[in-house]
């Protein structure tokens, strides 16, 4: 029984990995059909549906992975780091690095892979970015409490600026067919971003 569950879980993971790889390839700029995905995995479409009731559920699983990966690591940064600037830098670098290491998933983060899918999926990505922006806003607000001095610019504006930078770099990565990596020249870019945090 345990072997059957493990085999089923492994097949589910194989399907999700194939979908992520297809999103990373030139297929990712077009609608991915279950027929193409089944061919990529080497199974029938019916076999896909034994593991996932719909393609939407496959995307849901990938979005869950993205959410868990980013939010868990952001929470670790907040737990381990106390300096506001360091926290912000590490969160931004985390988002950019995650996108760079997972090009197919970056197509989901930017919405490119979801254009042909249910609107609900884009809504989940929007919620994820709202959560990240709320985390950034909280870090910015805590500066006054932690360091005795806050920012002169509204924290809402600063948080949205940081997130817009991340989204822009991820979009550039996708638009360039993954040529321009989001973390390229990050050490030179960060002082420009940090200078806006006043």
Swiss-Prot record:
The keyword Transmembrane does not apply. Residues 117-144 form a coiled coil. Pfam families: SlmA-like_C, TetR_N. Signal peptide: none annotated. It is found in: Cytoplasm, Nucleoid. It comes from the Bacteria. PROSITE patterns: HTH_TETR_1 (PS01081), HTH_TETR_2 (PS50977). Required for nucleoid occlusion (NO) phenomenon, which prevents Z-ring formation and cell division over the nucleoid. Acts as a DNA-associated cell division inhibitor that binds simultaneously chromosomal DNA and FtsZ, and disrupts the assembly of FtsZ polymers. SlmA-DNA-binding sequences (SBS) are dispersed on non-Ter regions of the chromosome, preventing FtsZ polymerization at these regions. NCBIfam families: PRK09480.1 (NF007015). Homodimer. Interacts with FtsZ. This is Nucleoid occlusion factor SlmA. The gene is slmA.
């Amino acid at each position: 029984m345990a072997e059957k569950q493990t085999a089923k879980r492994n097949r589910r993971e194989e399907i999700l990995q194939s979908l992520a790889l297809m999103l990373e390839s030139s297929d990712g700029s077009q609608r991915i059909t279950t027929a193409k995905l089944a061919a990529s995995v080497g199974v029938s479409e019916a076999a896909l549906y034994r593991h996932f009731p719909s393609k939407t559920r496959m995307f849901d699983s990938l979005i869950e992975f993205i959410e868990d990966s980013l939010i868990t690591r952001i929470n670790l940064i907040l737990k381990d780091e106390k300096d506001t600037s360091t926290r912000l830098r590490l969160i931004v670098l985390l988002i950019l690095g995650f996108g760079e290491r997972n090009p197919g998933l970056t197509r989901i983060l930017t919405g490119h892979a979801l254009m042909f899918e249910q609107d609900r999926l884009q809504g989940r990505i929007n919620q994820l970015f709202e959560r990240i922006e709320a985390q950034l806003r909280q870090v910015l607000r805590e500066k006054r409490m932690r360091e005795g001095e806050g920012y002169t610019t509204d924290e809402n504006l600063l948080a949205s600026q940081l997130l817009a930078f991340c989204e822009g770099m991820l979009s550039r990565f996708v638009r360039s067919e993954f040529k321009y990596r989001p973390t390229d020249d990050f050490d030179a870019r960060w002082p420009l971003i940090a200078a806006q945090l006043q």
